[in-house]
Swiss-Prot record:
Subcellular localization: Cell membrane
GO terms under cellular component: plasma membrane
Residues binding ATP, per UniProt: 40-47
InterPro entries to which the protein is assigned, alphabetical: AAA+_ATPase, ABC_carbohydrate_import_ATPase, ABC_transporter-like_ATP-bd, ABC_transporter-like_CS, P-loop_NTPase
Record family assignment: Belongs to the ABC transporter superfamily.
Pfam families registered for this protein in UniProt: ABC_tran
Predominant place of localization: membrane
Domain ABC transporter residue range list: 6-253, 327-572
Keyword Secreted: no
Organism, scientific name: Mycoplasma pneumoniae (strain ATCC 29342 / M129 / Subtype 1)
Record keywords: ATP-binding, Cell membrane, Membrane, Nucleotide-binding, Repeat, Sugar transport, Transport
Listed name of the protein: Putative carbohydrate transport ATP-binding protein MPN_258
Stretches that traverse the bilayer: none
Amino acid sequence: MSKIAFRMENICKSFDNGRVKANVDVNLTVYENTVHTLLGENGAGKSTLTSILFGLYQPDSGKIFIGEEEVHFKSSKDAVQHKIGMVHQHFKLVDNYTVLDNIILGNESSFSIPFTNGKLKLPLLHRKASEAKIQAMMERYDLHVNLHQKVSRLTVGQQQRVEILKVLFRDSDILIFDEPTAVLSDQEIKSFLNIIKNFKKMGKTIVLISHKLNEIKEVAETATILRQGHSVGTFQIKDTSIDEMARLMMGKELKETKNNTQFTAKGEPVLKVENLHLYLNQNWFYKLIARWNQKRINQLQKQGKPAKTLWLKSWLEGLAAIEKTPRFIRGIVNNLGFGSQQVFDKGISFEIHKGEIFAIAGVEGNGQNQLIDLICGLEKAAPKKVFFNGFDISRYSIRKRINAGIGFVLEDRHKYGLILDQTVRFNAVNNQIDRKQFSSWNFLNQMQIAVYTNQIVDKFDVRGAVQGTAIVRLLSGGNQQKLIIGRELTKQNELLVFAQVTRGLDVGAISFIHQKILDAKKQNNAILLVSYELDEILAIADTIGVINKGNLLEVNKRDVMTRERIGKLIMQ
């Protein structure tokens, strides 16, 4: 039998003065050169347990052994010294730094010179030495990324590779991955699973937290179940079916949630998007010129004149294409988006009616985020592009859209959904605090807020809320998501916009949220669902549109849009 890599005995950890018990007498043993997964519902204590192993939290009681040595970690620095590394669900990267700087941050190589009693380190970074080590790691583990690119310009999958390289750069032998595939596309997930297999071949020990049971079945050997903070058993993956794993994790049988209705559009649309252009280049100057150009073309067409590209746009594109253009000027033009940037002038158009779930399928990075931003008001569209109940809301503020009856659950819940250092109660009403139900004459009605919050907590099973008094940061990621979804589904909205709504949720919570979305459909809400999970779209959508490179290629009924058809459109 393999040697024990580490074991944790009778680990207890609580928060909020003991009111939230995250781990209760948890035992975990993981062997060297294995992939061991932690399974459990949202809030079961998985992330807390691994955070204790990585030194981010100190246990209230219990023991940790690395091999046969008992250790006491006061910080993550102590864990790193024992060759433990962790890749968090929410990446810990500095966006404005390069990949190289992010990898070496906190573990920099420096120049040194011979001195009387050894070597004297100079306050100068030895970047070439660090870069050479990282290049060798990338070749060895087949983890390639541009070291000189800024992190802000990387895809989510590439950012994850940077996090993995950070861990490897510190020579970690025990690697912890917390929900590593929650934000990845299908292709990136395949790549990640291959990385895990390579790590095992090279002798690494992997601890994997994931709710995606098919992925666990592919790479893991053993699993430990956590339920409400307790460890309830360990089993061999190869001897256990996916259905059985789900039952063990939830403690009950799961019912399939599926949209079995046939939708027929009636009346005027709730949301109408008309010839909306998605400029995938993030540069504000490019968007300004592109929209100015489109406006001019529309005016010429109305006047019956031939369409002509704006002279400034043509000139900038010409500079990028001409070989005689000085390199530094061409570089500036390319950075502005007028070189290799491909322009898509077709425009997106679709309608969503009452009682309809309209889903948008596609690989991440094809314009989904831009579309959501324009509908929700994070970005302003050109006039007469976005209509809600017949009113042009293209230039409405976010507040005005919320007051009109639009609710949204956006992909980045920490940035757009929650104020992490406030209570559950505050977050339950923070975008509707001006309603008479919750405040009058600038005084908050704390009783009504508490009652309303408790309804959301009970109805949506938000665990660890402590009757709404808990700080949101202390909730698990899945329970944070359930709080946001509960808030938006409890409000009187006519349009609900969901982006990656089940990201990071366990299988039971996913089924529960799907049912709540179907209930909202029955109540005649119009629903826009943007998801990278094809199974989710096929299970609950009425109408499916496929987005590719900023264009909506096809919109059709669920019965027509088979998995194969959607796949072909995505790959075009």
